[in-house]
């Protein structure tokens, strides 16, 4: 299969290149850029020399339609809204890693992303690609909205409750931490070493654009689920997300019963690992992999459940899940090209 990537010079795009180099069905990778065409790709990422030696190609739909079988879009917001309709018209399936197509209501998107939404028809034709939960829809999809990094960790952590109608949304707090690579490669004051090192800070309080994405999916699984309290924090690490969720425990269920619910729910999901009683995951334990590790417990004193979910934001939170969706779309084993062991320590 010939695969194209728009936005290969970003961290998510570079991770796609790394993964696809090990994918048995990736015959060729063509990397596109509207600003750096002709530039040697390895000049941007020297660690990929002798692995991805190609030059960046110009973005022209006339040539693209004859070059590739599927396109990943790993570009900033706005690019997919422009290119997805063109690629769809050319009959090329698209997996979009941006947030352009995740929010079904254009007005909600514009409120949270502070930019014009993609065409409504394009948004409505996109399948939300949370791989473990949307397999049937993904199998026949031609346009996939790859979930955001925070929503992936949070939704996988809450799905067993919400899909069984057990989520108690009267009290639901999501406290999430991320590594700095989630902010992208472009330099900024907030990601400057002197600002980040030996520091830990909250950001986008009550304004994080992943909030409506989480709420939208929870309401789809358990109608009537209300707003959540979501806080994002920037940790002094390169990769990783830890989402800790606090909610009222399902009525009449012990910690062991809730844990069994989770284990049964994900028993056929290779990439979701439910930790045993008393064992809680750390971001380092999924580093560089497509795994999501989850622990769940119930405090019988407060009758509240605590769910901890960890992922690598560039893998399960972006490129890894995108390739997992590619595998599902094509009827391949989900793990194809994704069986890399977490890098530890």
Swiss-Prot record:
Signal peptide: none annotated. Its EC number is 1.2.1.38. It is found in: Cytoplasm. It catalyses: N-acetyl-L-glutamate 5-semialdehyde + phosphate + NADP(+) = N-acetyl-L-glutamyl 5-phosphate + NADPH + H(+). It comes from the Bacteria. The active site is at residue 149. Keywords: Amino-acid biosynthesis, Arginine biosynthesis, Cytoplasm, NADP, Oxidoreductase. GO terms for cellular component: cytoplasm. InterPro entries: AGPR_AS, AGPR_type-1, NAD(P)-bd_dom_sf, NAGSA_dehydrogenase, Semialdehyde_DH_NAD-bd. SUPFAM superfamilies: Glyceraldehyde-3-phosphate dehydrogenase-like, C-terminal domain, NAD(P)-binding Rossmann-fold domains. PROSITE patterns: ARGC. One of its GO terms (biological process) is L-arginine biosynthetic process. Pathway: Amino-acid biosynthesis; L-arginine biosynthesis; N(2)-acetyl-L-ornithine from L-glutamate: step 3/4. One of its GO terms (molecular function) is NADP+ binding. The keyword Lyase does not apply. PANTHER family: N-ACETYL-GAMMA-GLUTAMYL-PHOSPHATE REDUCTASE, CHLOROPLASTIC-RELATED, N-ACETYL-GAMMA-GLUTAMYL-PHOSPHATE REDUCTASE, CHLOROPLASTIC-RELATED-RELATED. Belongs to the NAGSA dehydrogenase family. Type 1 subfamily. Catalyzes the NADPH-dependent reduction of N-acetyl-5-glutamyl phosphate to yield N-acetyl-L-glutamate 5-semialdehyde. This is N-acetyl-gamma-glutamyl-phosphate reductase. The gene is argC.
């Amino acid at each position: 299969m010939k695969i194209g990537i728009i936005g290969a010079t970003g961290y998510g795009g570079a991770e796609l290149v790394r993964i696809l180099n090990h994918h048995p069905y990736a015959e060729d990778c063509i990397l596109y850029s509207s600003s750096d065409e002709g530039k040697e790709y390895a000049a941007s990422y020297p660690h990929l020399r002798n692995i991805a030696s190609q030059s960046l190609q110009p973005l022209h739909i006339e040539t693209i339609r004859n070059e590739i079988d599927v396109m990943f879009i790993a570009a900033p917001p706005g690019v997919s809204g422009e290119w997805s309709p063109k690629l769809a018209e050319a009959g090329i399936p698209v997996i979009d890693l941006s947030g352009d197509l995740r929010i079904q209501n254009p007005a909600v998107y514009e409120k949270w992303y502070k930019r014009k939404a993609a065409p409504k028809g394009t948004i409505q034709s996109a399948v939300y690609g949370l791989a473990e939960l949307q397999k049937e829809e993904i199998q026949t999809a031609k346009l996939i909205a790859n979930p955001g990094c925070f929503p992936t960790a949070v939704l996988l952590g809450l799905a067993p409750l919400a899909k069984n109608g057990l989520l108690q949304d009267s009290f639901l707090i999501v406290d999430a931490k991320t590594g700095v690579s989630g902010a992208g490669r472009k330099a900024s004051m907030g990601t400057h070493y002197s600002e980040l090192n030996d520091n830990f800070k909250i950001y986008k309080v009550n304004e994080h654009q992943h909030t409506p994405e989480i709420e939208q999916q929870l309401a789809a699984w358990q109608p009537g689920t209300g707003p959540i309290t979501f806080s994002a924090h920037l940790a002094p690490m390169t990769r990783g997300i830890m989402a800790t969720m606090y909610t009222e425990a399902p009525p009449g269920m012990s910690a062991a019963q809730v844990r069994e619910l989770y284990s049964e729910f994900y028993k056929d999901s290779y990439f979701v690992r439910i930790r045993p009683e008393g064992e809680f995951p750390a971001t380092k334990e999924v580093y560089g992999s497509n795994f999501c590790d989850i622990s769940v417990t119930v405090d019988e004193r407060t009758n509240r459940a605590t769910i901890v979910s960890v992922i690598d934001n560039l893998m399960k939170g972006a490129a890894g899940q995108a390739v997992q969706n590619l595998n599902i779309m094509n009827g391949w084993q989900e793990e194809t090209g994704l069986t890399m062991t977490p890098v530890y320590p």
